[in-house]
Amino acid sequence: MQSYQQPLRVGVGGPVGSGKTALLEALCKAMRDHYQIAVVTNDIYTKEDQRILTEAGALEPERIVGVETGGCPHTAIREDASMNLAAVEALARKFGNLEVIFVESGGDNLSATFSPELADLTIYVIDVAEGEKIPRKGGPGITKSDFLVINKTDLAPYVGASLEVMERDTQRMRPQRPWTFSNLKKGEGLQAVIDFIVERGMLGVRG
């Protein structure tokens, strides 16, 4: 039987449209020359996020697997993660030397969490366009994720959101837990996410 190493599994969750797929694309492009990476995406009825990442050239197509969850996307990453676990294992066996597998959840709500059997680290993405109140609404995505990304800071003036208020509320809701503002269109905040993954995932700095 061919042996393979167990990769670091990083769960990426967040509401629809918050920027999960954009974050994954940016992470893959920034890290692929230094680490062996693969991705599992989740969509309810399609494999749209897999297609987006493939067409963007985030990774080689065979390193990106789409899972059609059906029903509630929360269930597929928490209560019954069997489809995702199977996809992760299949990728790990196929490549043998994978160091990181990103698992992107389908669009979900603030209560969504990853099963510890599926994700070693969790990143949760929200966006400023949802309003400055989002951090203080709490929920496990806000309070319990290992790293929080508040994306689309460039939209703050257009939606009447105060980044100062969001910063204050975030620090109050998740004291001692890391987070960052980001504008992924310009790459802002990306390095903070990479540094977190490398440090907490004990990957070793390369490049």
Swiss-Prot record:
SUPFAM superfamilies: P-loop containing nucleoside triphosphate hydrolases. It is found in: Cytoplasm. Its main location: cytoplasm. GO terms for cellular component: cytoplasm. One of its GO terms (biological process) is urea catabolic process. Keywords: Chaperone, Cytoplasm, GTP-binding, Nickel insertion, Nucleotide-binding. It comes from the Bacteria. One of its GO terms (molecular function) is GTPase activity. It holds the Pfam family cobW. Gene3D superfamilies: P-loop containing nucleotide triphosphate hydrolases. The keyword GTP-binding applies. GTP binds at residues 14-21. Belongs to the SIMIBI class G3E GTPase family. UreG subfamily. Homodimer. UreD, UreF and UreG form a complex that acts as a GTP-hydrolysis-dependent molecular chaperone, activating the urease apoprotein by helping to assemble the nickel containing metallocenter of UreC. The UreE protein probably delivers the nickel. NCBIfam families: ureG. Facilitates the functional incorporation of the urease nickel metallocenter. This process requires GTP hydrolysis, probably effectuated by UreG. This is Urease accessory protein UreG.
